[in-house]
């Protein structure tokens, strides 16, 4: 049992918790939720014993094994699977003892250690690690590649696999779905449902929380508020609680009335039975929980587009990929897709199948290798992808960005608009380089929404966003009148905002006749088929020499095609190492206590400014590196 007793916790001068108490029972699975900055990660630090409370206590059994996801992954030469196995610290300790016992030829010690390894189920550790990696999206070949060969997002998956492999009584997961695609999210959800220990989970993905947790701890007003049930149950309970506060009643009714009008309109035009039924349930649920978000700090909406050409986009027999001429690598082939006003499409498919490639083709970032992509005259594009965050001017403010976009607006009008995205007061004048990932994402969305797009392309728009902002974005998209294409691992957003799904697989883009539950079944079938094919391949020796020759030829061709991109990645890695060394040097200097004496004020100020600049440069290079790695992954899987 975990007992928080009269807990008080500060971050700097900010009071996070004050006399807060709560209890988590053994083997209970708890969702820890609350607004950004409320103290969720600090509570994790308390549980990991990295932080001490200002007052009160946190108690749990001293013999509990605690596992969590490391945030750093060094560029190691060891294989992915060996790195994951290092997560089982007791296994590694016993292996080291066994090596020493073998060196001494100590038969008694060897026998004793083998017995301890047997208790740990050590002989299956390779297969268990491989199973975790497969579930998180690694191919069999990738499990033996060195850790340093993977991009930042994939290294975070390795850290997650490490934490899952480690035997634990208490598992702490802070936003584990952040670097995952939908397939891996679904797999992780199933794994956590089966987990036998106590779980405390921070997540902004309500559809991920629901099947897993049986209790919610909500940090609000410096207290730990306990709710029994899953996240959906918490929303209803909190909505009921807030509805009893009469001062909010009128706002709640306006919100409910607004959603009801949309539901009525959707009923009148729903055509695709399965998807329509699924979306209707989702929208009706949004109406039910609307009062829980009446205090949401985000209040923006999409204004009607100035024009709605029909069709907006026509794609005929187009192929898409990377490179030019003979060196081009085709990712998608013979795409046929028409987007009209009111099209609401969610893209499904495994990681590397080409979902982002299709979005880039629609956005004009990629030119079709063959076929045609025709945008109508008057298309106003709104395009959100993670690399769009880097188009922001680091030294300029949110106010500056908006004034550049809307010079005819007064400063107060711009401030009011930015306020609907929770940029208030002095925040609008702060340089973007000081913003968190979530704040940058909000600013990019603010710029997009202002332009009244009639074609909206969203590639993982909820990364970095908290639950309130995700809810606000979902509500805004419900009312959006243009054409929408979205890639997201947030199933709540998909259920509420799209009316049809397209499946991207085997170089094809095809309509998927079903809902997200049907997609989960399709994934399970695909995974079973893949495993069977591997088994058949192992047993089939016919023409093996010819097959190996053909495989070597293809590998050589692919190496040649990807050589420029690999060179770029190597150069970016060198830059990353350079900036990391610079940052480490600065932080070593900042650790010197004498630096904070009054006479060193000028030096301290210069070092802090330098730290900000180097961090920004490192972030920019890492983002560019991850984009290049994604392109390489898609080329390798083509």
Curated annotation (Swiss-Prot):
Coiled-coil intervals: none
PROSITE patterns: ABC_TRANSPORTER_1 (PS00211), ABC_TRANSPORTER_2 (PS50893)
GO terms, molecular function: ATP binding; ATP hydrolysis activity
Superkingdom, natural source: Bacteria
Compositional bias of kind Basic and acidic residues: 547-558
Region (Disordered): 525-563
Binding site for ATP 1: 34-41
Record: residues binding ATP 2: 349-356
A family per Pfam: ABC_tran
Tagged with keyword ATP-binding: yes
Keywords attached to this entry: ATP-binding, Nucleotide-binding, Repeat
Residue ranges of every copy of the ABC transporter domain listed in the record: 2-246, 313-531
InterPro entries found in the cross-reference section: AAA+_ATPase, ABC_tran_Xtn, ABC_transporter-like_ATP-bd, ABC_transporter-like_CS, ABCF_EF3_subfamily, P-loop_NTPase
UniProt similarity note: Belongs to the ABC transporter superfamily. ABCF family. YheS subfamily.
Job of this protein: Genetic data indicate it may be involved in ribosome assembly or function.
This protein's name: Probable ATP-binding protein YheS
